[in-house]
Curated annotation (Swiss-Prot):
Keywords: Cell membrane, Cell wall, Glycoprotein, GPI-anchor, Lipoprotein, Membrane, Repeat, Secreted, Signal. Residues 373-540 are annotated as: 14 X 12 AA approximate tandem repeats. One of its GO terms (cellular component) is fungal-type cell wall. Transmembrane segments: none annotated. InterPro entries: SRP1_TIP1, Yeast_SRP1/TIP1_CWP. Extensively O-glycosylated. Residues 1-19 form the signal peptide. Residues 354-372 have a biased composition (Low complexity). The lineage of its organism: Eukaryota, Fungi, Dikarya, Ascomycota, Saccharomycotina. Component of the cell wall. PROSITE patterns: SRP1_TIP1. This is Cell wall protein DAN4.
Length: 1161
């Protein structure tokens, strides 16, 4: 989410009142507009510094004013530094980044509208389609001239592609094939949701020629999918007056647009054929047509969680090496251009593009206007239709907050929050004599919006009885967009809405106990000792995805209040960076006397090369092998393996020469090896060692020389070792890179190996990629992670039985020392929409005839979670009374059951300790003085009253997942395409207890059982006869998690009370440092029934997952602690039952693809 907090300082430069009351139309490059745009741009760089860092590395020729870098690292009033930058320079910088449409435009529009500035270019025309069930608010047609500039990054990458002038002509033909496909495919996802198809399909036109950028402007066809009815106004009018049993599930807007937002970067596949062979480009163009719905995310998706998920994208660049052993010299390098699989797997870039736009505007002008003006049913909110300078008109990019407080005898709280550019969340609370909860949640794109009300709705939240007729209402609801968002919905690009209400108008829980045994002994215990919880949460947007910033909770509470911050470290962890480096060989390398083909090994080392041997001299003289290595930025590394029928020779010396290609983003390195014929053969090379200082143009914000404490350096080394003897093949590579910024030091090393014995058909691989991130902020911490991958797979051709085993183990460790603050709430949203495209090459052999099929498998997985919470509260009060010297104990149990439905959200703590669900246990001990008189004798006793309040929430999650798989099979020369829809309904019930961030008082015991049933309909045709099969896929997943709390207690106070000769000792303890150990075992058994020719076969694919975590919480006065956990270590074993030989191991990478692979049978 873009932090626009600096805009507050910019607005002071403009006229304050006059500019807001009257709408002014200014020239596009007015000085105020420049300053506001630059403030948003600088704030966005701070919030996504590594994303800009990566962008600058791929566009080194771009220049930036030195004032930008100075402003990024100057947290004071930096606005005066930016006054000298021209409007054209501002437009070039801001619109040149790929996330301009999705993130910068809404933020700039919001910032400009707050200053009363609305810019428009009236020459363009557009059509608006608004979907809303409550009111039709027409949005004005505004276009921007600089929205299509997002296509410029494609031209820079493609410039490296053509090695000869002839090859550059062939890719242009592929453009014609991509243009029509975009229109046709855009109709396909219309059924699911509009926002997927729209516009900006221009980015997929990768051809190097600049003319291609003009062809896709006919994106008006994408207006049809505006049927997205994102039922934002699904007002689920759950205004159930009584708070009890209002289990109305807010299943609102599960229409979550499967916003195929993956921006599948398939366009980059056209840059892969760096080896001048043109035949490869034609195949890649067909691949890019499959996910034609790719470019949508650049138009609308307010990819809120893209900051955290972008890091994990590099993990999917795992592997492929695809080359056959055909002894060809030139065509060998073309075969492995199928490495586009690694690029298409970058689907997690927009894994959580929670688009809430309900209105899409497609215009005939070069820019697409997207209006997220969303009409709401609240009459208090005036027009949301206001022209904005950017091409995405957001009527109210900042949520319009209207708080109405009605003062009456029965205090009512009515707060209405409307957010347009984000999921509209309307929360209405009415508090009367009996606290009535009326929660109205309206979610548009996905049920990702969260309304969390930390209010004293529980009738014990009042430490002072306010008896005045006028409600004493504390409503923390500030509308400021500063980084210290206190209880305010600050949602422009991230649909995380949090509302906190604190009110002291709640009734006092009064427990009136009358003993009937003796005359007139009345004990009135009024539980008015519980405090008013008034918490102000101050959060600061993270500077980067590594989350080195730390927030503080400032809480004003009574002595008995506990500000329980919740923690999350399981699923959403932005600092968990997993980089996989897998080596996969698709063919066997045998000994021969021919010049071998090249093998491509893809790792995420940031280096892409293709090596091809060019000459080989006979053994009578010194052997000389020369190879040319072409490097680019596609994160791959390629080496050549030389085979020989005679004893292989080691190279004795090598010369390396490197040169840079200034016209593009690649460099060329040439390596020549010399050897004597008496030694065995091997290849050893060291690649790419570079370092830069703070003035290097390759580093983002390198002009920060004005800041003496800032320094930037990059060091990257890569070594590889390949040896082939006459009987075995062994490959190993290592890569180490590190860079230092003003607040971070990151180092990454990747070590991978591959081995295969020619006498065996089994090859093995292993890789390790440890990562270390050290923070240089005021809270010093070091975070390290390591991913170890290993596996065995068969590489023999023409084998009908294949077994593959893959094991992945990831470990994370966080060490935090001397933090200024311990814990702060941070909202996260758990709703996910992802599109995955996997291209699989299957070789089938029958009767000595082998056929290779290229089967694209597209998986669309849309998830929407609805949580129904049932809360049981049991209050047990024990009162001891002693009338007439006889003591009796009376226990008064009070059970309260509350049920509410809410969209799922996770509250994470800064140290990412644990996931939390709203479960709370309180222990309250009061000391009461009771005077009892009987027969003229009075006795005063100190009676301790212990109240135990145990709350346990049962969360029931119902998840509907629809996976549509397209499979192409060829039999007898006839190919047919099957579309297999798989609908998965998962239901889980989880009962958990709370782990508190501060004191970790409780144990956790969680048991989860989920039953997964998928029913697949497959139609198979053979010889003109079609058969429809109903293939049930059942999966049973049982998870058990236990968390033990070994706690050391520290005595705090000992109190002795004596009365009437009887003494009572009361000891109060404080919880010491706790250590949690969590272990879990999950076994998923998937059974697939396949029927063919009247014979049915059942295949079972077990997946075992074991997790173990050790958690040491950070106390409030933290000195040093360590948090370590190891993520899932899983093993997948699949037997194909003699059907096909899957020669790409990444089929088994995920469970869903494993099921798809079985369905291929």
């Amino acid at each position: 989410m873009v932090n626009i907090s600096i805009v507050a300082g910019i607005v002071a430069l403009a006229t304050s009142a006059a500019a807001i009351t009257a709408t002014t139309t200014l020239s596009p490059y007015d000085e105020r507009v420049n300053l506001i745009e630059l403030a948003v741009y600088v704030s966005d760089i701070r919030a996504h510094i590594f994303q800009y860092y990566s962008f600058r590395n791929h566009h080194k020729t771009e220049t930036y004013p030195s004032e930008i870098a100075a402003a990024v690292f100057d947290y004071g009033d930096f606005t005066t530094r930016l006054t000298g930058i021209s409007g054209d320079e501002v437009t070039r910088m801001i619109t040149g980044v790929p996330w301009y449409s999705t993130r910068l435009k809404p933020a700039i529009s919001s910032a400009l509208s707050k200053d009363g500035i609305y810019t428009a270019i009236p020459t363009s025309t557009s059509t608006t389609t608004t979907k809303s069930s409550t009111s039709t608010t027409p949005t004005t047609t505004i276009t921007s001239t600089t929205s299509t500039t997002s296509t410029t990054p494609t031209t820079s990458t493609t410039s490296t592609t053509p090695t000869t002038s002839t090859t550059s002509t062939t890719p242009t033909t592929s453009t014609t094939s991509t243009t029509p496909t975009t229109s046709t495919t855009s109709t396909t996802p219309t059924t699911s949701t509009t926002s997927t198809t729209p516009t900006t399909s221009t980015t997929s036109t990768t051809p190097t020629t600049s003319t291609t950028s003009t062809t896709p402007t006919t994106s008006t066809t994408s207006t049809t999918p505006t049927t997205s009815t994102t039922p934002t106004t699904s007002t689920t009018s759950t205004t159930s007056q009584t708070s009890t049993k209002s289990t109305t599930p807010t299943t609102s807007s599960t229409s979550t647009t499967p916003t195929t937002s993956t921006t599948p970067t398939t366009s980059t596949t056209s840059t892969a054929p760096t080896t001048s062979t043109t035949s490869t480009t034609s195949t890649t163009s067909t691949i890019s047509t499959a996910p034609t719905t790719s470019t949508t995310s650049s138009t609308f998706s307010t990819s809120s969680a893209s900051a955290s998920s972008v890091i994990s994208t590099t993990a999917t660049t795992s592997t492929t090496f695809a080359s056959l052993t055909t002894p060809a010299t030139s065509t060998a390098s073309t075969d492995h251009t199928t490495s586009s699989v690694s690029t298409t797997n970058a689907f997690t870039t927009s894994a959580t593009t929670t688009t809430t736009s309900d209105t899409y505007i497609s215009s005939s002008s070069p820019s697409q206007v997207t209006s997220s003006a969303e009409p709401t049913t609240v009459s208090e909110v005036t027009s949301s239709v206001e022209p904005t300078r950017s091409s995405q008109v957001t009527s109210s990019a900042e949520p319009t907050t209207v708080s109405e407080f009605t003062s009456s005898v029965e205090p009512t709280r009515s707060s209405q929050v409307t957010s347009s550019a984000e999921p509209t969340t309307v929360s209405e609370f009415t508090s009367s004599v009996e606290p009535t909860r009326s929660s109205q949640v309206t979610s548009s794109a996905e049920p990702t919006t969260v309304s969390e009300f930390t209010s004293s709705v529980e009738p014990t939240r009042s430490s002072q009885v306010t008896s005045s007729a006028e409600p004493t209402t504390v409503s923390e609801f500030t509308s400021s967009v500063e980084p210290t968002r206190s209880s305010q919905v600050t949602s422009s690009a991230e649909p995380t809405t949090v509302s906190e209400f604190t009110s002291s108008v709640e009734p006092i829980r009064s427990s009136q106990v009358t003993s009937s045994a003796e005359p007139t002994t009345v004990s009135e215990v009024t539980s008015s000792v519980e405090p008013i919880r008034s918490s102000q949460v101050t959060t600061t947007e993270p500077v980067s995805s590594f989350g080195s910033t730390f927030s503080e909770i400032t809480s004003s509470a009574e002595p008995l209040s506990f500000s329980k911050a919740t923690t999350s470290a399981e699923s959403i962890s932005s600092n968990q960076i997993t980089i996989s480096s897998e080596l996969i060989v698709s063919s066997v390398i045998t000994s021969s006397s021919e010049i071998p083909s090249s093998i491509e090994v893809l790792t995420s080392s940031g280096i892409s090369s293709s090596v091809e041997p060019t000459s080989l001299v006979g053994p009578s003289s010194d052997e000389s092998i020369s190879s040319t290595e072409s490097l680019s930025a596609t994160s791959t590394f390629t080496s050549a393996v030389v085979s020989s029928s005679k004893a292989a020779d080691f190279f004795t010396r090598s010369t390396v020469s490197a040169k840079s290609d200034v016209s593009g983003n690649s460099s060329t390195q040439s390596t020549t090896f010399f050897a004597t014929p008496s030694t065995p053969l091997a290849v050893s090379s060291t690649v790419v060692t570079s370092s830069t200082d703070s003035v290097s143009p390759n580093i983002p914000f390198s002009e920060i020389s004005s800041s003496p404490e800032s320094s930037t350096a990059i060091t990257s080394t890569s070594t590889s070792f390949i040896a082939e003897r006459t009987s075995s093949l062994y490959l190993s590579s290592s890569n180490m890179s590190s860079f230092t910024l003003s607040t971070f030091t990151v180092s990454q090393s990747i070590v991978s190996s591959f081995s295969m014995e020619p006498t065996s058909s089994v090859a093995s691989f292993a890789s390790s990629s440890p990562l270390l991130v050290s923070s240089r902020s005021n809270c010093s911490d070091a975070r390290s992670s390591n991913t170890i991958s290993s596996g065995l797979f068969s590489t023999i051709e023409n084998v009908r039985n294949a077994t593959s085993t893959f094991t992945n183990l990831s470990t994370d460790e966080i060490v935090i020392t001397s933090c200024k603050s311990s814990c702060t709430n941070e909202d996260s949203v758990l709703t996910k929409t992802q599109v995955s495209t996997v291209e699989t090459t299957i070789t089938s052999c029958s009767g000595g005839i082998c056929t290779t099929l290229m089967s694209p498998v597209t998986t669309i997985n849309a998830k929407a979670n609805t949580l129904t919470t049932t809360e049981t509260s049991t209050v047990e009060t024990t009162i001891t009374t002693c009338p007439g010297g006889v003591c009796s104990t009376l226990t008064v149990p009070v059970t309260t059951i509350t049920s509410e439905a809410t969209t799922t959200a996770t509250i994470s703590c800064e140290d990412n300790e644990e996931d939390i669900t709203s479960t709370e246990t309180e222990l309250l001990t009061l000391e009461t003085t009771i005077t009892s008189c009987s027969g003229g004798i009075c006795t005063t006793l100190m009676s301790p009253v212990t109240t135990i309040n145990a709350k346990a929430n049962t969360l029931t999650t119902t998840e509907t997942s629809t996976v549509e798989t397209t499979i192409t099979t060829c039999s007898g020369g006839v190919c047919s395409t099957l579309t297999v829809p798989v609908t998965t309904i998962t239901s889980e019930a989880t009962t958990t207890a709370t782990i508190s961030c501060e004191d970790n008082e409780e144990d956790v015991a969680s048991t989860k059982t989920e039953l997964l049933t998928m029913e697949t309909t497959i139609t198979s045709c053979s010889g003109g006869i079609c058969t429809t099969l109903m293939s049930p896929v059942s999966s049973f997943n049982s998870k058990a998690t236990t968390s033990n709390n070994a706690e050391s207690t520290i005595p705090k106070a000992i109190k002795v009370s004596c009365s009437a000769g009887a003494c009572t000792t009361l000891t109060t303890v404080d919880a010491g440092i706790s250590m949690f150990t969590r272990t879990g075992l999950s076994i998923t058994q998937t059974t697939v029934t396949n029927c063919s020719g009247g014979t049915c076969t059942m295949l079972t694919a077990p997946i075992a997952t074991a997790t173990s975590k050790v958690i040491s919480p950070i106390p409030k006065a933290s000195s040093a602690t360590s948090i370590a956990h190891s993520s899932a270590s899983y093993t997948v074993s699949i037997n194909t039952n003699g059907a096909y030989n899957f020669d790409k191991d990444n089929i088994f990478g995920t469970a869903i693809v494993a099921v798809v692979a079985l369905l291929l049978l």
